[in-house]
Amino acid sequence: DMTVIDVGQGTSVLLRTARHTLLYDTGPQYSRESDAGGRVLLPLLRSLGEERLDLLMLSHRDSDHVGGAGAVLRGLPVTRLASSLETSHGLLALAGTLGVDREPCVAGRRWTWDGVRFELLHPTAEALAAAELGKTRPNTLSCVLRIGGRWGGQAHTALLTGDLEREQEARLVAQHGGSLASEVLLVPHHGSKTSSSAAFLDAVAPRVAVVQAGYRNRFGHPAMEVLARY
């Protein structure tokens, strides 16, 4: 079960298998007193009867992706946190105090829950090491997660991309080619002009493309020229 959550200008996707739950990003912080974690995600998870998260994945450090993470960590037991955050980031420290296992998103990591396959395609260990030296922009480190499984007698796939940009898209195409093909694509970077290159879209060839962006947002997401490529 995959739920793309309306958090306004930000990203959050809930993935549930028969016995496991993964939350990919936590949306924005709306103000000092309010964020998507407390206002949207915790009420949603509780309404669905979810009492814990097996994995919280934070694609990168931008506030529209991690703004609700503190509230989620404090409000619900979390087993593991995977992210591209630098090791000094406050959310990793918070997770540590709460007894959450912390690990980096690293390309090549795979696991299976209840017959559903998960694989991280990005970032590389080298990119994460460069980020620790302040040599990498957060968007370029976005955790890219591929999900695949069978239900209804058919194979289904989805690709979650964070704020991935064209250069990283090109590397994925060069490395994976047509195996990137996915039925559902979370449109990179909210439909920004920085992303959704033609070669990447040809490789992924999504049947459904989902843009997470706030109504009349100040960034102009999604860009009309990007939508035209879909």
Per-segment meaning from a language model:
Residues 1-230:
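Non-globular, low-confidence helical/coil segments that flank catalytic cores
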